Regions:
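Alpha-helix-loop-beta-strand connector modules within alpha/beta enzyme cores
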Residues: 121-138, 199-221, 274-305, 348-359
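Glycine-rich phosphate-binding active-site loops on the catalytic face of alpha/beta enzymes
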Residues: 88-96, 254-261, 313, 319-347
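Glycine/Thr-rich beta-alpha phosphate-binding loop at enzyme active sites
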Residues: 32-45, 189-198, 238, 242-303
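C-terminal helical cap(s) of enzyme catalytic domains, especially alpha/beta-barrels
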Residues: 99-111, 264-278, 336-361
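A gly/proline- and charged-residue-enriched helix-loop-helix capping module
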Residues: 92-140
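Active-site glycine- and acidic-residue-rich loops that bind
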Residues: 151-168, 196-197, 202-203, 226-246
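Glycine-rich beta-to-alpha transition loops that act as phosphate-gripper elements at the mouths
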Residues: 67-70, 144-148, 229-235, 303-317
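Catalytic cores of alpha/beta
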Residues: 74-79, 233-247, 299, 313-330
Length: 402
């Protein structure tokens, strides 16, 4: 155990030196190698204030691992052992999809730009033996599933929205006995389902069919059903999306990247504009937009559906901003781990505990949506004070007759 801890600390020093002074791509490779080997030390900080009861479980921390980090079953369980309370494999399509994929790292902005037209993954069918093998591990783990972009385009042109239902149902049926939650991924910026997220006639049948399928496939303990929405949503579309999620009675909603550089002029990444780069971005530049999206969604959901957030979380402050906006859980993504290293979990836990105690919260649950609730209260109070006050000249005359 001591040897493993020393090895982990040594790897962490090398990793951090590579990020700060040399080559982020090599740090990226070292990160995955170290996690696959299980060499990095635990970063869990035990404090009851971080605990929350959610989805029929007690989670010791609101911090988890986003999808996109582990598509081959190599590192997620190692990360869970480091102290994260939940994690997501994927995203996966039914069969293997390997579109061209290139990543660009921007250290100063703590951002990663990916140029990829689809969901690069080995496919659910190939991963099934691994899911079966790890089914009895105690970790609270989900699987993210999606439809290939080319399938979506073909189905939309032919008006065959039912094809989405069939494919999501088939994937859900296979994985339901082997996970704690299933995430229906509508977030890819190149995805037509991303555009149709506001169309209840397309999304609701998928949600309802999957919920019914998982009950039949895993009757004793059916997995929860989450929906992952795109960050590229127009803020004016949030009420429609919230109505669809409530009507579908989903168990959770995931608000996460990536964001499209082409669609979001607010995103500024040093070097990307000069080279006229396009693609999808994760990391620090998405944080502000993610927080605002959480706040608006929380307002319309009225706390009835837990929000799982992921977007530019690099310390306790940015994690708390998501929580205060309305997120019940917070995920770290690939950018967080690469630019801050595996030690980010200890950093976030330590700083989050300090923030919660400083703000006089007795439990983590009390902090969820605290900023948003204040904004709602102020807005309601403002609307009340701005109502015209009619003062009758004669108290015997009813106000409507004046």
């Amino acid at each position: 155990m001591e040897k493993s801890r020393n090895t982990g600390n040594f790897l962490f020093i090398i990793f951090w030196w590579l990020v700060q002074h040399l080559n982020i791509r090599w740090a990226h490779k070292l990160l995955y190698w170290g996690l696959r080997d299980g060499s990095f030390p635990s970063g869990h900080v035990s404090d009851p204030i971080l605990g929350i009861d959610l989805f029929g479980r007690h989670l010791s921390t609101p911090l988890g691992i986003s999808d996109g980090l582990d598509k081959r079953g190599n590192i997620l369980d190692t990360l869970m052992q480091m102290g994260y309370s939940f994690g997501t494999f994927g995203p996966y399509t039914l069969e293997k999809e390997m579109p061209p994929n290139e990543k660009f790292f921007f250290k100063k902005d703590k951002a990663i730009i990916t140029q990829c037209t689809g969901y690069r993954n080995p496919g659910i069918l190939k991963m099934m033996p691994w899911f079966v093998k790890r089914r009895y591990l105690p970790h609270f783990v989900g699987i993210d599933i999606a439809i290939p972009a080319e399938n979506e385009e073909s189905n939309i042109k032919q008006g065959r929205h039912f094809a989405y239902v069939d494919e999501f149902v088939l994937m859900s049926q296979r994985i339901a006995p082997y996970c704690d939650f299933i995430t229906l991924d509508f977030s890819h910026t190149n995805s037509e389902l991303c555009v149709l997220m506001v169309d209840a006639s397309t999304i609701l049948p998928i949600i309802r069919a999957v919920k019914e399928t998982v009950k039949q496939a895993a009757p004793i303990r059916p997995p929860k059903v989450f929906v992952k929405i795109p960050l590229d949503l127009n803020m004016m579309e949030i009420p429609l999306v919230a109505q669809t999620l409530l009507a579908g009675e989903v168990d959770g909603v995931v608000v996460a990247g990536p964001m499209s550089l082409a669609k979001n002029t607010r995103i500024r990444i040093q070097g990307a504009k000069e080279h006229q780069m396009s693609g999808m971005v994760i990391g620090q530049p998405t944080h502000e937009y993610t927080t605002e999206l959480i706040r608006r969604l929380y307002t319309h959901l009225k706390g009835r559906i837990p929000i799982i957030a992921c977007g530019g979380v690099f310390d306790g402050k940015t994690a708390f901003e998501h929580i205060a906006a309305g997120a019940s859980l917070v995920s770290v993504d690939e950018a967080s781990l690469i630019f801050e290293g595996p030690g980010i979990i200890h950093k976030i836990h330590k700083e989050l505990i300090e923030i919660l105690h400083h703000k006089k919260f007795h439990s983590f649950a009390e902090a969820i949506g605290c900023d948003t609730q204040e904004v709602i209260s102020e807005t309601n109070a403002s609307m009340t004070t701005k109502q015209p006050q009619t003062t009758p000249t004669d108290s015997s005359v009813p106000p409507q007759q004046i």
